[in-house]
Amino acid sequence: MIMTRKNILKAQRIVVKIGTSSLILPNGKINLSNIDELAFVLSDLNNKGYEVILVTSGAIGVGLNVLGMNKRPKGIADQQALASIGQVELMSLYTQMFRRYSQKVSQLLLTRDVTDFPTSRENPENALNALLALDIIPIINENDAIAVDEMDHQTKFGDNDKLGAIVSKLVHADLLIMLSDIDGLFDKNPTIYDDAKIFNEIHEITDELRQMAGGAGSRFGTGGMTSKLAAAQILFENDQEMVLTNGERIREIQQIIEGREIGTYFHQKF
């Protein structure tokens, strides 16, 4: 029996966050087929009347590809240079792919100091609302080329999972779909344990969940799940919802919006 997540059926304004692992192949090359498929699916949603915002990672990964480098440099200035180079190429790829489906896109690069304060926060909020009204799909990334935290001036979001949640909060999104390298949240690492079970729904971010998703000594042990729980917590505090799912199956986004039980659904109890 196919179950339906009925509350998702009401979603009209949707934020999709895609991570570097879904954009860059294991050999360091750009995953062109994934970007093309993403452009098709989001353009199709826009044609159907949904308001869509894309939060993307990948600037440094694409920068490495552009320069033919296979190792991320340790120096902050070198990483910023790569982000600057990669962001141009990344947006060029997105523009080309979306153009195939007659969809216009825009770019917005954010830093934490802009979204943390009510006065400055109004600017990206107003810009995003205006872009959506123009039938544009905004593409958002952190401004990695300039974002560096100092003692009294925080400019970095920390990761783009958090950025996806903050953007969802900013635009009062009905749903955040987070594309990852895993099918959802499991009770233990499914790449190691054959009996790992996926959580269909999560209603609260507990200390037990955080410990399970935490560092190298945890049962889970895969990087990035802690940041996804932190993003979910931001959404819970705003009475918003998120689905965590696999970025290798981008076409499932449509089924998720239709309420199909795919991935892990984070929402407060109805």
Curated annotation (Swiss-Prot):
- What EC number(s) does this enzyme carry? 2.7.2.11
One MF term in GO for this entry? glutamate 5-kinase activity
Organism name: Lactococcus lactis subsp. cremoris (strain SK11)
**Gene3D superfamilies to which the protein is assigned, alphabetical:** Acetylglutamate kinase-like
What residues does substrate bind to? Answer: 57, 144, 160
What this protein catalyses is: L-glutamate + ATP = L-glutamyl 5-phosphate + ADP
This protein's record includes keyword Transmembrane helix = no
Q: Which UniProt keywords apply?
A: Amino-acid biosynthesis, ATP-binding, Cytoplasm, Kinase, Nucleotide-binding, Proline biosynthesis, Transferase
Q: Tell me the pathway.
A: Amino-acid biosynthesis; L-proline biosynthesis; L-glutamate 5-semialdehyde from L-glutamate: step 1/2
- Role noted for this protein: Catalyzes the transfer of a phosphate group to glutamate to form L-glutamate 5-phosphate.
Location of the protein in the cell: Cytoplasm
The Gene Ontology biological process terms listed for this entry are: L-proline biosynthetic process
Q: State a GO cellular component annotated for this protein.
A: cytosol
Q: Of which family is this protein a member? A: Belongs to the glutamate 5-kinase family.
Highest taxon, organism lineage? Bacteria
> Which InterPro entries is this protein grouped with?
AceGlu_kinase-like_sf (IPR036393), Asp/Glu/Uridylate_kinase (IPR001048), G5K_ProB (IPR041739), Glu/AcGlu_kinase (IPR001057), Glu_5kinase (IPR011529), Glu_5kinase/COase_Synthase (IPR005715), Glutamate_5-kinase_CS (IPR019797)
User: What protein is this chain from?
Assistant: Glutamate 5-kinase
Originating gene: proB
Binding, ATP: 17, 180-181, 222-228
